[in-house]
Protein backbone atom coordinates (compact mmCIF):
# COMPACT_ATOMS: atom_id res chain seq x y z
CA UNK A 1 0.00 0.00 0.00
CA UNK A 2 1.39 3.41 -1.02
CA UNK A 3 0.69 5.60 2.01
CA UNK A 4 2.24 8.72 0.50
CA UNK A 5 -0.03 8.45 -2.49
CA UNK A 6 -3.06 8.15 -0.27
CA UNK A 7 -2.19 11.06 2.02
CA UNK A 8 -1.48 13.18 -1.05
CA UNK A 9 -4.90 12.36 -2.44
CA UNK A 10 -6.58 13.49 0.77
CA UNK A 11 -4.47 16.63 0.85
CA UNK A 12 -5.46 17.55 -2.70
CA UNK A 13 -9.13 17.06 -1.87
CA UNK A 14 -8.82 19.12 1.32
CA UNK A 15 -7.03 21.93 -0.47
CA UNK A 16 -9.97 22.45 -2.80
CA UNK A 17 -12.73 22.30 -0.24
CA UNK A 18 -15.24 24.99 0.50
CA UNK A 19 -18.52 24.90 2.36
CA UNK A 20 -21.43 23.30 0.56
CA UNK A 21 -23.63 26.11 1.81
CA UNK A 22 -22.78 29.69 2.77
CA UNK A 23 -23.91 32.38 5.15
CA UNK A 24 -22.01 35.15 3.35
CA UNK A 25 -23.47 38.70 3.48
CA UNK A 26 -22.25 39.55 -0.03
CA UNK A 27 -24.62 41.16 -2.55
CA UNK A 28 -24.83 37.88 -4.44
CA UNK A 29 -26.77 36.44 -1.52
CA UNK A 30 -29.07 39.43 -1.05
CA UNK A 31 -32.33 37.62 -1.78
CA UNK A 32 -34.90 35.67 0.12
CA UNK A 33 -33.61 32.24 -0.94
CA UNK A 34 -32.69 30.25 2.19
CA UNK A 35 -29.11 28.97 2.26
CA UNK A 36 -28.55 25.60 3.88
CA UNK A 37 -25.90 25.50 6.55
CA UNK A 38 -23.06 23.08 5.92
CA UNK A 39 -22.88 20.37 8.58
CA UNK A 40 -19.76 20.58 10.72
CA UNK A 41 -18.70 17.09 9.61
CA UNK A 42 -18.75 17.92 5.89
CA UNK A 43 -16.62 19.96 3.51
CA UNK A 44 -17.20 19.98 -0.24
CA UNK A 45 -15.23 21.17 -3.23
CA UNK A 46 -16.31 24.17 -5.28
CA UNK A 47 -18.20 22.04 -7.79
CA UNK A 48 -19.98 20.25 -4.97
CA UNK A 49 -19.33 16.82 -6.49
CA UNK A 50 -16.85 15.64 -3.84
CA UNK A 51 -17.19 16.00 -0.09
CA UNK A 52 -14.91 14.92 2.75
CA UNK A 53 -16.62 13.55 5.86
CA UNK A 54 -14.83 13.77 9.21
CA UNK A 55 -15.62 13.39 12.89
CA UNK A 56 -19.15 12.66 14.08
CA UNK A 57 -22.29 12.74 11.95
CA UNK A 58 -24.50 14.29 14.61
CA UNK A 59 -27.67 14.93 12.62
CA UNK A 60 -29.74 13.08 10.04
CA UNK A 61 -27.86 13.24 6.76
CA UNK A 62 -28.25 11.85 3.24
CA UNK A 63 -25.37 10.98 0.93
CA UNK A 64 -26.59 11.54 -2.63
CA UNK A 65 -25.54 9.70 -5.76
CA UNK A 66 -24.30 12.85 -7.53
CA UNK A 67 -21.52 13.37 -4.97
CA UNK A 68 -18.45 11.29 -4.11
CA UNK A 69 -17.94 11.11 -0.34
CA UNK A 70 -14.52 10.59 1.26
CA UNK A 71 -14.27 9.13 4.78
CA UNK A 72 -11.28 10.85 6.37
CA UNK A 73 -10.31 9.15 9.61
CA UNK A 74 -12.79 7.60 12.01
CA UNK A 75 -16.27 8.78 11.00
CA UNK A 76 -18.97 8.02 13.58
CA UNK A 77 -22.70 8.02 13.07
CA UNK A 78 -23.97 9.32 16.40
CA UNK A 79 -22.28 9.07 19.79
CA UNK A 80 -23.48 5.67 20.98
CA UNK A 81 -19.99 4.18 21.30
CA UNK A 82 -19.34 6.06 24.54
CA UNK A 83 -19.68 4.26 27.87
CA UNK A 84 -23.20 3.92 29.27
CA UNK A 85 -23.58 3.97 33.04
CA UNK A 86 -27.36 3.66 33.45
CA UNK A 87 -30.43 2.44 31.59
CA UNK A 88 -31.33 6.07 30.99
CA UNK A 89 -28.17 6.39 28.86
CA UNK A 90 -29.45 3.65 26.57
CA UNK A 91 -32.85 5.30 26.29
CA UNK A 92 -31.25 8.66 25.55
CA UNK A 93 -28.98 7.17 22.88
CA UNK A 94 -32.00 5.72 21.12
CA UNK A 95 -34.06 8.90 21.45
CA UNK A 96 -31.20 11.07 20.18
CA UNK A 97 -30.19 8.65 17.44
CA UNK A 98 -29.38 9.96 13.98
CA UNK A 99 -29.74 8.27 10.61
CA UNK A 100 -27.20 8.25 7.79
CA UNK A 101 -29.03 7.55 4.54
CA UNK A 102 -27.09 6.60 1.41
CA UNK A 103 -28.83 6.79 -1.96
CA UNK A 104 -28.59 4.01 -4.56
CA UNK A 105 -25.49 4.32 -6.74
CA UNK A 106 -23.53 6.47 -4.27
CA UNK A 107 -19.72 6.24 -4.34
CA UNK A 108 -18.13 6.34 -0.87
CA UNK A 109 -14.32 6.30 -0.63
CA UNK A 110 -12.06 5.74 2.34
CA UNK A 111 -8.76 7.47 2.95
CA UNK A 112 -5.98 5.31 4.39
CA UNK A 113 -7.41 5.63 7.91
CA UNK A 114 -11.04 6.02 6.86
CA UNK A 115 -13.54 3.96 8.87
CA UNK A 116 -17.32 4.30 9.10
CA UNK A 117 -18.76 3.39 12.51
CA UNK A 118 -22.52 3.29 13.03
CA UNK A 119 -22.75 3.53 16.81
CA UNK A 120 -25.39 2.23 19.23
CA UNK A 121 -28.83 3.79 18.93
CA UNK A 122 -28.16 5.13 15.42
CA UNK A 123 -28.89 3.84 11.93
CA UNK A 124 -27.35 3.36 8.52
CA UNK A 125 -29.95 3.22 5.75
CA UNK A 126 -27.88 2.04 2.78
CA UNK A 127 -30.45 0.69 0.33
CA UNK A 128 -28.98 0.31 -3.12
CA UNK A 129 -30.61 -1.50 -6.01
CA UNK A 130 -29.48 -4.23 -8.37
CA UNK A 131 -28.89 -1.63 -11.07
CA UNK A 132 -27.40 0.98 -8.72
CA UNK A 133 -25.51 -0.64 -5.85
CA UNK A 134 -23.85 1.47 -3.16
CA UNK A 135 -20.05 1.12 -3.22
CA UNK A 136 -17.50 1.65 -0.46
CA UNK A 137 -13.92 1.52 -1.74
CA UNK A 138 -10.49 3.12 -1.56
CA UNK A 139 -9.59 6.69 -2.43
CA UNK A 140 -6.23 5.41 -3.67
CA UNK A 141 -7.32 4.37 -7.17
CA UNK A 142 -10.29 3.75 -9.42
CA UNK A 143 -10.13 -0.05 -9.57
CA UNK A 144 -10.97 -2.66 -6.96
CA UNK A 145 -7.76 -4.72 -6.92
CA UNK A 146 -6.22 -3.23 -3.76
CA UNK A 147 -6.04 -4.89 -0.35
CA UNK A 148 -6.21 -3.08 2.97
CA UNK A 149 -6.24 0.39 1.43
CA UNK A 150 -8.70 1.83 3.97
CA UNK A 151 -10.51 0.74 7.13
CA UNK A 152 -13.99 -0.66 6.56
CA UNK A 153 -17.55 -0.48 7.88
CA UNK A 154 -18.41 -1.18 11.53
CA UNK A 155 -21.95 -1.43 12.87
CA UNK A 156 -22.42 -1.40 16.63
CA UNK A 157 -25.73 -2.37 18.17
CA UNK A 158 -27.51 -2.92 21.46
CA UNK A 159 -27.98 -6.68 21.09
CA UNK A 160 -26.35 -9.15 23.50
CA UNK A 161 -22.69 -10.11 23.49
CA UNK A 162 -21.37 -12.89 25.69
CA UNK A 163 -17.99 -12.99 27.38
CA UNK A 164 -15.70 -15.93 27.99
CA UNK A 165 -17.20 -18.84 29.91
CA UNK A 166 -20.10 -16.99 31.53
CA UNK A 167 -18.29 -13.74 32.17
CA UNK A 168 -18.17 -10.37 30.51
CA UNK A 169 -19.67 -6.93 30.47
CA UNK A 170 -23.26 -8.18 30.38
CA UNK A 171 -22.95 -10.73 33.19
CA UNK A 172 -23.71 -10.49 36.90
CA UNK A 173 -23.02 -12.61 39.97
CA UNK A 174 -25.19 -15.71 40.17
CA UNK A 175 -25.79 -18.38 42.82
CA UNK A 176 -22.98 -20.55 44.16
CA UNK A 177 -20.14 -18.40 42.86
CA UNK A 178 -21.44 -18.53 39.29
CA UNK A 179 -22.16 -15.76 36.83
CA UNK A 180 -25.35 -15.36 34.82
CA UNK A 181 -26.36 -13.24 31.87
CA UNK A 182 -28.04 -10.14 33.26
CA UNK A 183 -30.94 -9.01 31.07
CA UNK A 184 -31.09 -5.71 32.93
CA UNK A 185 -27.38 -4.91 32.81
CA UNK A 186 -25.97 -1.86 31.09
CA UNK A 187 -23.29 -3.36 28.83
CA UNK A 188 -20.16 -1.71 27.49
CA UNK A 189 -18.10 -4.14 25.41
CA UNK A 190 -14.86 -2.73 24.00
CA UNK A 191 -14.87 -3.10 20.23
CA UNK A 192 -11.98 -4.21 18.04
CA UNK A 193 -10.46 -1.91 15.49
CA UNK A 194 -8.17 0.45 17.38
CA UNK A 195 -8.51 3.66 19.33
CA UNK A 196 -11.81 5.43 18.97
CA UNK A 197 -13.95 2.40 18.16
CA UNK A 198 -15.46 2.54 21.63
CA UNK A 199 -18.20 0.34 23.03
CA UNK A 200 -21.06 -1.80 21.82
CA UNK A 201 -23.58 -4.30 23.18
CA UNK A 202 -26.73 -4.32 25.25
CA UNK A 203 -29.81 -6.36 26.04
CA UNK A 204 -32.05 -5.66 23.05
CA UNK A 205 -31.98 -8.69 20.69
CA UNK A 206 -34.36 -6.95 18.26
CA UNK A 207 -32.27 -3.77 18.06
CA UNK A 208 -32.40 -2.10 14.65
CA UNK A 209 -29.26 -0.52 13.18
CA UNK A 210 -30.81 0.05 9.75
CA UNK A 211 -30.50 -1.58 6.32
CA UNK A 212 -27.63 -2.71 4.09
CA UNK A 213 -28.96 -3.89 0.76
CA UNK A 214 -27.14 -4.05 -2.56
CA UNK A 215 -23.95 -2.76 -0.96
CA UNK A 216 -20.35 -3.46 -2.04
CA UNK A 217 -17.38 -2.99 0.29
CA UNK A 218 -13.98 -3.30 -1.39
CA UNK A 219 -10.23 -3.03 -0.59
CA UNK A 220 -10.67 -2.48 3.14
CA UNK A 221 -9.06 -4.04 6.22
CA UNK A 222 -7.21 -1.84 8.70
CA UNK A 223 -4.92 -3.64 11.17
CA UNK A 224 -4.86 -1.89 14.55
CA UNK A 225 -2.73 -4.51 16.31
CA UNK A 226 -2.43 -8.27 16.91
CA UNK A 227 -5.91 -9.84 16.72
CA UNK A 228 -7.34 -6.34 16.49
CA UNK A 229 -8.56 -5.47 13.03
CA UNK A 230 -11.32 -3.77 11.09
CA UNK A 231 -12.98 -6.30 8.82
CA UNK A 232 -14.75 -5.46 5.59
CA UNK A 233 -18.03 -5.49 7.50
CA UNK A 234 -17.79 -5.78 11.28
CA UNK A 235 -21.03 -6.50 13.15
CA UNK A 236 -20.76 -5.80 16.88
CA UNK A 237 -23.84 -6.66 18.91
CA UNK A 238 -26.11 -5.98 15.94
CA UNK A 239 -29.75 -6.90 16.50
CA UNK A 240 -32.12 -8.86 14.29
CA UNK A 241 -34.17 -5.74 13.59
CA UNK A 242 -31.35 -4.86 11.17
CA UNK A 243 -31.58 -5.96 7.52
CA UNK A 244 -28.45 -7.21 5.72
CA UNK A 245 -29.19 -8.65 2.28
CA UNK A 246 -27.28 -8.60 -1.01
CA UNK A 247 -23.89 -7.48 0.27
CA UNK A 248 -20.44 -8.08 -1.24
CA UNK A 249 -17.12 -7.77 0.58
CA UNK A 250 -14.20 -7.87 -1.84
CA UNK A 251 -10.43 -7.92 -1.31
CA UNK A 252 -10.46 -7.27 2.42
CA UNK A 253 -7.12 -7.62 4.21
CA UNK A 254 -8.76 -9.41 7.14
CA UNK A 255 -12.15 -11.15 7.40
CA UNK A 256 -14.97 -10.52 5.00
CA UNK A 257 -17.73 -10.34 7.64
CA UNK A 258 -17.26 -10.92 11.36
CA UNK A 259 -20.03 -11.12 13.93
CA UNK A 260 -19.19 -10.27 17.54
CA UNK A 261 -22.27 -11.47 19.38
CA UNK A 262 -25.56 -10.04 18.21
CA UNK A 263 -28.55 -11.63 16.54
CA UNK A 264 -28.63 -10.16 13.02
CA UNK A 265 -29.50 -12.59 10.22
CA UNK A 266 -27.73 -12.23 6.87
CA UNK A 267 -28.77 -13.41 3.40
CA UNK A 268 -27.32 -13.21 -0.13
CA UNK A 269 -23.67 -12.35 0.41
CA UNK A 270 -20.72 -12.56 -1.97
CA UNK A 271 -17.30 -12.71 -0.35
CA UNK A 272 -14.44 -12.53 -2.85
CA UNK A 273 -10.67 -12.21 -2.54
CA UNK A 274 -10.66 -11.72 1.23
CA UNK A 275 -7.31 -12.54 2.80
CA UNK A 276 -8.42 -14.11 6.09
CA UNK A 277 -11.74 -15.80 6.96
CA UNK A 278 -14.86 -14.89 5.03
CA UNK A 279 -17.59 -15.78 7.53
CA UNK A 280 -16.41 -15.50 11.15
CA UNK A 281 -18.70 -15.53 14.18
CA UNK A 282 -17.99 -15.66 17.90
CA UNK A 283 -18.69 -14.17 21.38
CA UNK A 284 -22.24 -15.44 21.50
CA UNK A 285 -23.51 -14.66 18.02
CA UNK A 286 -26.98 -16.16 17.65
CA UNK A 287 -28.14 -15.94 14.08
CA UNK A 288 -28.81 -17.38 10.64
CA UNK A 289 -27.04 -17.04 7.30
CA UNK A 290 -28.39 -18.25 3.95
CA UNK A 291 -27.06 -17.96 0.39
CA UNK A 292 -23.36 -17.07 0.48
CA UNK A 293 -20.65 -17.42 -2.14
CA UNK A 294 -17.07 -17.48 -0.87
CA UNK A 295 -14.37 -17.25 -3.50
CA UNK A 296 -10.69 -16.92 -2.58
CA UNK A 297 -8.36 -14.85 -4.77
CA UNK A 298 -7.23 -17.06 -7.68
CA UNK A 299 -4.16 -14.89 -8.30
CA UNK A 300 -2.57 -15.20 -4.83
CA UNK A 301 -0.38 -18.05 -3.62
CA UNK A 302 0.20 -16.90 -0.03
CA UNK A 303 -1.86 -14.79 2.38
CA UNK A 304 -0.63 -11.63 4.08
CA UNK A 305 1.10 -11.88 7.45
CA UNK A 306 -0.43 -14.48 9.75
CA UNK A 307 -3.79 -14.67 7.99
CA UNK A 308 -5.49 -18.06 7.74
CA UNK A 309 -7.72 -17.91 4.66
CA UNK A 310 -10.65 -20.13 5.60
CA UNK A 311 -14.19 -19.95 4.34
CA UNK A 312 -16.01 -20.24 7.67
CA UNK A 313 -14.54 -19.89 11.14
CA UNK A 314 -16.60 -20.15 14.30
CA UNK A 315 -14.66 -19.54 17.52
CA UNK A 316 -15.44 -20.59 21.07
CA UNK A 317 -12.24 -21.97 22.55
CA UNK A 318 -9.58 -20.99 25.07
CA UNK A 319 -9.78 -17.22 25.62
CA UNK A 320 -12.73 -17.12 23.20
CA UNK A 321 -14.69 -19.87 25.00
CA UNK A 322 -18.32 -18.70 24.75
CA UNK A 323 -20.76 -21.63 24.73
CA UNK A 324 -23.73 -19.36 23.97
CA UNK A 325 -22.44 -19.04 20.37
CA UNK A 326 -24.92 -20.58 17.92
CA UNK A 327 -25.07 -20.24 14.14
CA UNK A 328 -27.21 -21.91 11.48
CA UNK A 329 -26.03 -21.62 7.88
CA UNK A 330 -27.57 -22.84 4.63
CA UNK A 331 -26.74 -22.85 0.94
CA UNK A 332 -23.12 -21.81 1.17
CA UNK A 333 -20.57 -22.35 -1.62
CA UNK A 334 -16.95 -22.22 -0.45
CA UNK A 335 -14.32 -22.11 -3.20
CA UNK A 336 -10.66 -22.15 -2.21
CA UNK A 337 -7.59 -21.44 -4.34
CA UNK A 338 -3.82 -21.80 -4.26
CA UNK A 339 -3.75 -19.30 -1.38
CA UNK A 340 -5.69 -21.74 0.81
CA UNK A 341 -2.86 -24.29 0.98
CA UNK A 342 -2.85 -25.89 4.43
CA UNK A 343 -6.28 -24.52 5.31
CA UNK A 344 -9.80 -25.78 5.95
CA UNK A 345 -12.97 -24.75 4.20
CA UNK A 346 -14.59 -24.58 7.65
CA UNK A 347 -13.07 -24.53 11.10
CA UNK A 348 -15.72 -25.01 13.77
CA UNK A 349 -13.83 -24.52 16.97
CA UNK A 350 -14.87 -24.88 20.56
CA UNK A 351 -17.99 -24.93 22.68
CA UNK A 352 -20.46 -23.76 20.10
CA UNK A 353 -23.56 -25.04 18.35
CA UNK A 354 -23.49 -25.02 14.56
CA UNK A 355 -25.92 -26.41 12.00
CA UNK A 356 -24.96 -26.30 8.33
CA UNK A 357 -27.32 -27.25 5.50
CA UNK A 358 -27.00 -27.80 1.74
CA UNK A 359 -23.43 -26.55 1.49
CA UNK A 360 -20.53 -27.27 -0.89
CA UNK A 361 -16.80 -27.01 -0.10
CA UNK A 362 -14.22 -27.21 -2.88
CA UNK A 363 -10.49 -26.48 -3.30
CA UNK A 364 -9.38 -26.57 0.31
CA UNK A 365 -6.94 -29.18 1.57
CA UNK A 366 -9.50 -30.30 4.14
CA UNK A 367 -13.17 -29.46 3.99
CA UNK A 368 -14.18 -29.43 7.66
CA UNK A 369 -12.21 -29.25 10.90
CA UNK A 370 -14.08 -29.69 14.18
CA UNK A 371 -12.28 -28.83 17.43
CA UNK A 372 -13.68 -29.24 20.91
CA UNK A 373 -13.19 -26.42 23.42
CA UNK A 374 -10.27 -26.16 25.76
CA UNK A 375 -11.78 -23.89 28.41
CA UNK A 376 -8.60 -23.08 30.28
CA UNK A 377 -10.34 -24.03 33.54
CA UNK A 378 -10.76 -27.14 35.67
CA UNK A 379 -13.78 -27.98 33.55
CA UNK A 380 -11.36 -29.23 30.91
CA UNK A 381 -12.74 -29.78 27.44
CA UNK A 382 -16.30 -29.15 26.28
CA UNK A 383 -17.48 -30.77 23.07
CA UNK A 384 -18.62 -28.80 20.09
CA UNK A 385 -22.12 -29.50 18.84
CA UNK A 386 -21.95 -29.68 15.06
CA UNK A 387 -24.72 -30.88 12.74
CA UNK A 388 -24.14 -31.23 8.99
CA UNK A 389 -27.07 -31.78 6.63
CA UNK A 390 -26.24 -32.35 2.96
CA UNK A 391 -22.73 -30.93 3.23
CA UNK A 392 -20.45 -32.18 0.46
CA UNK A 393 -16.81 -31.47 -0.26
CA UNK A 394 -14.14 -31.91 -2.91
CA UNK A 395 -10.96 -31.35 -0.92
CA UNK A 396 -7.45 -32.88 -0.99
CA UNK A 397 -5.20 -34.36 0.23
CA UNK A 398 -6.81 -34.77 3.65
CA UNK A 399 -10.29 -35.17 2.29
CA UNK A 400 -13.44 -34.21 4.12
CA UNK A 401 -12.74 -34.17 7.87
CA UNK A 402 -9.77 -33.13 9.98
CA UNK A 403 -9.71 -33.86 13.74
CA UNK A 404 -13.13 -35.47 14.09
CA UNK A 405 -16.47 -35.92 12.41
CA UNK A 406 -19.58 -33.87 13.10
CA UNK A 407 -21.81 -34.88 15.99
CA UNK A 408 -24.72 -35.44 13.63
CA UNK A 409 -24.79 -36.18 9.90
CA UNK A 410 -28.05 -36.10 7.96
CA UNK A 411 -28.52 -36.78 4.26
CA UNK A 412 -25.39 -36.80 2.11
CA UNK A 413 -22.31 -35.74 4.08
CA UNK A 414 -18.77 -36.34 2.89
CA UNK A 415 -16.48 -36.34 -0.13
CA UNK A 416 -18.20 -35.84 -3.48
CA UNK A 417 -16.68 -34.69 -6.77
CA UNK A 418 -17.83 -31.12 -7.41
CA UNK A 419 -17.80 -29.06 -10.58
CA UNK A 420 -19.10 -25.51 -10.82
CA UNK A 421 -20.63 -23.42 -13.57
CA UNK A 422 -19.95 -19.76 -14.32
CA UNK A 423 -23.01 -18.97 -12.20
CA UNK A 424 -21.23 -20.49 -9.15
CA UNK A 425 -23.79 -23.29 -9.21
CA UNK A 426 -23.03 -27.00 -9.07
CA UNK A 427 -23.18 -28.71 -12.46
CA UNK A 428 -24.81 -31.77 -10.92
CA UNK A 429 -28.58 -31.51 -10.59
CA UNK A 430 -28.83 -33.98 -7.73
CA UNK A 431 -31.74 -33.20 -5.42
CA UNK A 432 -30.82 -32.66 -1.78
CA UNK A 433 -33.86 -32.36 0.44
CA UNK A 434 -33.93 -31.21 4.05
CA UNK A 435 -36.63 -32.86 6.11
CA UNK A 436 -36.28 -30.53 9.07
CA UNK A 437 -34.77 -27.05 9.06
CA UNK A 438 -33.75 -25.68 12.44
CA UNK A 439 -32.87 -21.99 12.36
CA UNK A 440 -31.46 -20.32 15.44
CA UNK A 441 -34.30 -19.07 17.62
CA UNK A 442 -33.04 -15.54 18.24
CA UNK A 443 -36.49 -13.98 18.48
CA UNK A 444 -36.62 -12.88 14.84
CA UNK A 445 -38.89 -15.61 13.53
CA UNK A 446 -36.36 -16.29 10.76
CA UNK A 447 -37.17 -19.22 8.47
CA UNK A 448 -34.81 -20.72 5.91
CA UNK A 449 -35.93 -20.79 2.30
CA UNK A 450 -36.72 -24.45 1.68
CA UNK A 451 -34.19 -25.32 -1.04
CA UNK A 452 -33.63 -28.78 -2.50
CA UNK A 453 -30.10 -28.21 -3.79
CA UNK A 454 -26.58 -27.80 -2.46
CA UNK A 455 -24.77 -24.49 -2.83
CA UNK A 456 -25.62 -20.82 -3.05
CA UNK A 457 -27.11 -20.88 -6.56
CA UNK A 458 -29.63 -23.36 -7.93
CA UNK A 459 -28.15 -25.77 -10.52
CA UNK A 460 -29.21 -24.91 -14.04
CA UNK A 461 -29.24 -21.16 -13.36
CA UNK A 462 -27.56 -19.09 -16.07
CA UNK A 463 -24.90 -16.66 -14.86
CA UNK A 464 -26.95 -13.71 -16.10
CA UNK A 465 -29.91 -14.89 -14.05
CA UNK A 466 -28.11 -15.67 -10.78
CA UNK A 467 -29.10 -13.63 -7.72
CA UNK A 468 -25.63 -12.04 -7.69
CA UNK A 469 -25.68 -10.95 -11.34
CA UNK A 470 -25.73 -7.27 -12.22
CA UNK A 471 -24.63 -5.78 -8.91
CA UNK A 472 -21.39 -7.43 -7.78
CA UNK A 473 -18.02 -5.96 -8.75
CA UNK A 474 -17.28 -6.70 -12.40
CA UNK A 475 -15.05 -9.73 -12.81
CA UNK A 476 -15.06 -10.72 -9.15
CA UNK A 477 -16.66 -14.10 -9.93
CA UNK A 478 -15.16 -14.60 -13.39
CA UNK A 479 -13.45 -17.96 -13.78
CA UNK A 480 -14.89 -19.48 -10.62
CA UNK A 481 -15.73 -22.66 -12.53
CA UNK A 482 -12.06 -23.25 -13.36
CA UNK A 483 -10.36 -22.11 -10.16
CA UNK A 484 -7.12 -23.95 -9.33
CA UNK A 485 -6.90 -26.00 -6.15
CA UNK A 486 -4.09 -25.37 -3.63
CA UNK A 487 -0.84 -27.28 -3.65
CA UNK A 488 -0.91 -30.26 -1.30
CA UNK A 489 1.14 -28.88 1.56
CA UNK A 490 -1.32 -29.57 4.35
CA UNK A 491 0.03 -29.49 7.90
CA UNK A 492 -1.88 -28.99 11.15
What label would you give each PLM region?
Residues 3, 10-47:
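Bacterial Sec-dependent N-terminal signal peptides
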Residues 30, 34-97, 113-121, 128, ...:
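Extracellular beta-rich repeat passengers
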Residues 132-135:
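Glycine-rich loop(s) and the adjacent beta-strand/alpha-helix scaffold that form part
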